[in-house]
Amino acid sequence: MQLSQWRSSGHFLTVDGQQVFYKAEGTGPVLLLIHGYPTASFDWARMWPALTNLFHCVTLDMPGFGFSDKAPKKYLIKEQAATISEVIRHLGITSAHVLSRDYGDTVAQEMMAQQLENNLAFRIESLHLLNGGLFPETHRALFIQKLLLSPIGGLLIRLLNKNAIRKSMHNIFGPNTPPSNQDIDDFWTLISANNGHKYMHLLLDYMKQRKQYRERWVSALQNANVPLRLTAGMADPISGAHMVARYKQLIPNADVIE
């Protein structure tokens, strides 16, 4: 599916004064898909046809990403979880299986923490994590991410362009599955929509939040009251084999697909 088709087949919902792009298609049990950084719900486009044959799939561009509104502010993971809950409530959904990746894993961890506190607006039936920074001590941020998170990030972000995104994406894709030129074009369209490329450094605050809320978010996985699985690409330089090893150390009866 082309990016233009993805957008035209979606919808917008106003949440706390922000326009949030979402898609909901298919029949069957509800599957909520949560995207990564710095992309958007289009992460799931290639598997969308297969998944919607089996599930009622719901996904969205979290504020600050993709086609949703973007602003020069730091986005709290807790706020992203609240936005997702509002979309789920709007759709009349009371329970869902969750599939998440990267940044979305952190949002899913916060949602699981809320569920354990009986404070989530819907019930998570199962949680399937893909590669992500589940533990701040194993997260190997790219050099450019570290720079953008630093005090000079606001200056460096002015130099961000499609070529910089191309270089970063080639560094994190698998050696046998490099991004195509079309992939890079789509990534840049999503990042730069609504001037989002000017605010990417602010979104990186999630790396600080992972340290601040480590105990809460790791505990959410250790005490998860639903089936929990991790599927990991071991070659991921940011959250690959080293993260999986830590996952097996910390998560009881770890269910891992490598």
Where are these regions (language model features)?
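Alpha/beta-hydrolase fold catalytic core
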Residues: 1-31, 52-55, 89, 93-95, ...
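Active-site loop/oxyanion-hole signature of alpha/beta-hydrolase fold enzymes
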Residues: 15-17, 23-25, 59-103, 113, ...
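Conserved HGGG/HGGXW glycine-rich cap/lid loop of the alpha/beta-hydrolase fold
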Residues: 18-67
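Conserved hydrolase catalytic core segment
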Residues: 94-139
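Conserved alpha/beta-hydrolase catalytic His-Asp/Glu region
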Residues: 138-140, 159-223
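Short beta-strand/loop motif that positions the catalytic acidic residue
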Residues: 224, 230-232
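Acidic catalytic loop of the alpha/beta-hydrolase fold
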Residues: 234-239
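Catalytic histidine neighborhood in serine/cysteine hydrolases
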Residues: 241-244, 248-258
